[in-house]
From Swiss-Prot:
One of its GO terms (cellular component) is ribosome. PROSITE patterns: RIBOSOMAL_L20. This is Large ribosomal subunit protein bL20c. Binds directly to 23S ribosomal RNA and is necessary for the in vitro assembly process of the 50S ribosomal subunit. It is not involved in the protein synthesizing functions of that subunit. One of its GO terms (biological process) is translation. One of its GO terms (molecular function) is rRNA binding. Keywords: Chloroplast, Plastid, Ribonucleoprotein, Ribosomal protein, RNA-binding, rRNA-binding. Its main location: plastid. Signal peptide: none annotated. Belongs to the bacterial ribosomal protein bL20 family. It is found in: Plastid, Chloroplast.
Length: 128
């Protein structure tokens, strides 16, 4: 029986996997079985962390806004600020508010003071 030469399909598949894992350390970038295992693990982690990244950034923005609000000296909290923003129908999301709070505090203080003033006027109008 004559010798049969194998095709290139399996080799092409393995080189594709090796290119994916070329930055991994140790046997994870050299041995085919461990490469496939690490590739699956990396893709699972990437899928999980795409959702986690959104949550982490939202937490960071909320923390930054709250820190600047509480540092202003006025007894005002993040939750009251967001509540008043929604009441006034101001379309500023948490990402933009956090960027304003970090880069331009005076502008952020002006926004929050304007909201506080308009909130106090409405409360007095409701009492009288």
């Amino acid at each position: 029986m004559t010798r049969v030469r194998r095709g290139y399909i399996a080799r092409r598949r393995r080189t594709k996997i090796r290119l994916f894992a070329s930055t991994f350390r140790g046997a994870h970038s050299r041995l085919t079985r461990t490469i496939t295992q690490q590739k699956m693990r990396a893709l699972v982690s990437a899928h999980r962390d795409r959702g986690r990244k959104k949550r982490d950034f939202r937490r960071l923005w909320i923390t930054r806004i709250n820190a600047v609000i509480r540092g202003s000296g006025v007894s005002y909290s993040y939750s009251r600020l967001i509540h008043d923003l929604y009441k006034r129908q101001l379309l500023l999301n948490r990402k933009i508010l956090a960027q304003i709070a970090i880069s331009n505090r005076n502008c952020f203080y002006m926004i929050s003071n304007q909201i506080i003033k308009s909130g106090e006027c409405e409360e007095f109008n409701g009492i009288i």
